[in-house]
């Protein structure tokens, strides 16, 4: 249910997975009560061997009996150990970072350098050539294609100061090998690690990008690294092309630029900042022609004559089309570059008059360079400016929280101006807000379903304890693997909660079945009888539980060694389920019997008091 409530890109990514599991569970349930019984009748022939004679079952029960007997002797200690494990997990949980989604490796690096507004075409072309040459020097790079400027379409609003370079990589099998660092290993284990894992390892994606970023730290250029599809989605969703961005809203562009520059200086001091760039909203350069109407009239010219000369000689005019085979190209005419590349040359451009005279343009207009907005952003009916922040080595949530504290302490935002944190952080906050009320609602629905099944609040609560206890293993495995909390991780945790609750239900059903049967047979007169019933019921659950864990582990462990596109997302889903199944097994086989014993013993004690009977205590705890 929580996955179906996700929206936007996270919903499109994970809803198919949820639909697949839902349909699979539905048809599996349907077939288990229709096809499976029929096949059992047809295929299971001859004498059926009792479970007590099954060697696997006998082996598992032999291992489990000492455990459950110890648990029933030290019930409170067992529960205390479980609670202590949960408490010890809290620091690890708090140290987990947060992000929207793990990086989805597309196999292509998208490099987006940003310069100050006003860069010329010649400078931009030269800069692209230098950057492409540096990128192509890396042995992992197959080919590089860079561009500056944009197409004449509203779907590509990139300014000329923002370049885009596509870096296509070779297959990972052809990447460089680096020495494996095992300095943190104990000295006796290092040779074993070299023997089993090898003395070298391939360079990682993050290390390759870090080397490229270091090689491309050019003066006046702010680097941003992403991937093509991810970049397009981010740009269309929020307009921010980096993991984190700040949108500044206000009535005056000049003030917005000042706030952006101040934010740029402050954010550079935040640990984990790779590059930060505030848009120079008013940093565009313009060539202004202020026409002298009296001078134009004195020479018998009109404003249109002068403007046409400026447009044709300087901007160029298409006069014809040349046909080259099946191809056609427009032919434009304008002054040579050396006659129009500075203001002095423009002042010498000659404007013909009706009587054949040639008048310098400088006598008919004042020509000067001015600055102004390179582009005007408007969002939510307000002027805006963006600050782009590219970060490395930190989780997005932790970085933004620290950055917010520094900005609040060092940046004074004037009245009428507001800051909005955007980028992937905006997605993360949106998903977090949605899950914050959907997950508790889902747990409430599960509790209601459990109560409808058991008709007991106590049993329902015992089953729900499976969820927090299963989180212990999930959190610790995430911590050791260095994974951040993300939507993918929460999807795995939600799936883990369902499996943990399911195994808890089966354990309670087995314990109840033996308890009720012995109660009907009159064999429930003491706590010793209760413990023997619990041992018998729990022992019946060992093999099904181990089969469930083995099947889930067999299906999930290969994901942890997978590579390629999508592997990083799938690992985040599988990791909490793998870690959680370990602690869920301990809970089901140890903690639930202890809690069940305390609850039933308390009920028997009060029942005995009400009937005036005294319950004895038997030490006969062996399974017959």
Predicted regions and their residues:
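Solvent-exposed, membrane-proximal periplasmic/extracellular interface segments of envelope transport
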Residues: 122-236, 240, 265, 294-316, ...
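Interfacial helix-loop-helix hairpins and adjacent transmembrane helices
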Residues: 9, 15, 34-86, 117-123, ...
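Hydrophobic transmembrane alpha-helices and their membrane-interface caps
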Residues: 5, 23, 31, 445-541, ...
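A short beta-strand structural signal in non-transmembrane regions
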Residues: 112, 165-167, 176-185, 190-209, ...
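Extracytoplasmic/periplasmic membrane-proximal domains and adjacent transmembrane bundles
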Residues: 224-226, 245, 257-260, 264-442, ...
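Transmembrane alpha-helices and their membrane-interface boundaries in multi-pass membrane transporters
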Residues: 1-6, 13-51, 165, 469, ...
């Amino acid at each position: 249910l929580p996955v179906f409530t996700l929206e936007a890109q996270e919903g499109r990514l994970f809803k198919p997975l949820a639909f697949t599991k839902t349909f699979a569970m539905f048809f599996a349930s349907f077939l288990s009560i229709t096809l499976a019984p029929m096949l059992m009748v047809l295929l299971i022939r001859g004498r059926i061997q009792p479970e007590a004679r099954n060697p696997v079952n006998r082996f598992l029960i032999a291992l489990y009996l000492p455990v459950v007997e110890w648990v029933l002797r030290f019930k409170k200690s067992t529960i205390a150990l479980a609670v202590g494990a949960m408490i010890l997990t809290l620091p690890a949980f708090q140290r987990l970072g947060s992000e929207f989604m793990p990086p989805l490796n597309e196999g292509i690096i998208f490099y987006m350098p940003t310069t100050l507004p006003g860069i010329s075409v010649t400078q931009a072309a030269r800069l692209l050539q230098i950057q492409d040459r540096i990128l192509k020097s890396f042995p992992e790079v197959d080919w590089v294609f860079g561009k500056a400027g944009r197409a004449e379409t509203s779907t590509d609003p990139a300014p000329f100061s923002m370049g885009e370079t596509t870096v296509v990589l070779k297959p990972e099998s052809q990447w460089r090998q680096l020495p494996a660092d095992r300095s943190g290993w104990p000295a006796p284990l290092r040779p074993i690690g070299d023997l089993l894992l090898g003395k070298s390892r391939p360079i990682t994606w993050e290390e390759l990008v870090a080397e490229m970023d270091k090689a491309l730290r050019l003066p006046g250029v702010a680097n941003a690294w992403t991937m093509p599809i991810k970049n397009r989605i981010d740009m269309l969703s929020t307009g921010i092309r980096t993991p984190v961005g700040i949108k500044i809203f206000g009535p005056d562009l000049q003030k917005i630029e000042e706030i952006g520059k101040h934010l740029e200086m402050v954010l550079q001091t935040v640990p984990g900042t790779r590059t930060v760039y505030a848009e120079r909203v008013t940093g565009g350069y313009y060539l202004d022609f202020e026409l002298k109407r009296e001078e134009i009239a004195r020479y018998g010219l009109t404003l249109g004559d002068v403007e046409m000369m400026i447009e044709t000689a300087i901007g160029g005019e298409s006069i014809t089309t040349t046909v080259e085979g099946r191809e056609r190209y427009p032919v434009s005419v304008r002054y040579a570059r050396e006659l129009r590349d500075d203001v002095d040359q423009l002042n010498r451009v000659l404007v013909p008059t009706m009587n054949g005279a040639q008048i310098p343009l400088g006598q008919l207009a004042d020509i000067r360079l001015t600055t102004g907005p390179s582009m005007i952003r408007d969002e939510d009916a307000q002027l805006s400016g963006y600050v782009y922040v590219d970060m490395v080595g930190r989780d997005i949530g932790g970085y933004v929280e620290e950055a917010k504290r520094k900005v609040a302490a060092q940046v004074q935002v004037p009245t009428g101006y507001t800051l909005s944190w955007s980028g992937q952080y905006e997605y993360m906050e949106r998903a977090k807000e949605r899950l914050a009320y959907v997950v508790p609602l889902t747990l409430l629905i599960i509790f209601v379903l459990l109560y409808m099944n058991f008709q007991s609040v106590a049993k329902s609560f015992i089953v729900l304890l499976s969820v927090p206890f299963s989180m212990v293993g999930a959190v610790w495995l995430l911590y050791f693997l260095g994974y951040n909390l993300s939507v993918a991780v929460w999807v795995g945790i939600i799936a883990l909660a369902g499996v943990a609750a399911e195994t808890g239900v089966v354990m309670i059903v087995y314990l109840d079945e033996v308890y009720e049967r012995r109660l009907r047979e009159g064999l429930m007169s003491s706590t010793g009888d209760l413990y023997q019933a619990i041992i018998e019921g729990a022992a019946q659950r060992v093999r099904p539980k181990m089969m469930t864990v083995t099947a889930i582990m067999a299906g999930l462990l290969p994901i942890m060694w997978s590579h390629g596109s999508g592997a990083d997302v799938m690992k985040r889903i599988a990791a909490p389920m793998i870690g959680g199944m370990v602690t869920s097994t301990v809970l089901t086989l140890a903690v639930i019997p202890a809690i069940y014993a305390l609850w039933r013993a308390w009920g028997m004690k009060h029942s005995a008091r009400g009937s005036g009977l005294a319950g004895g205590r038997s030490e006969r705890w062996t399974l017959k």
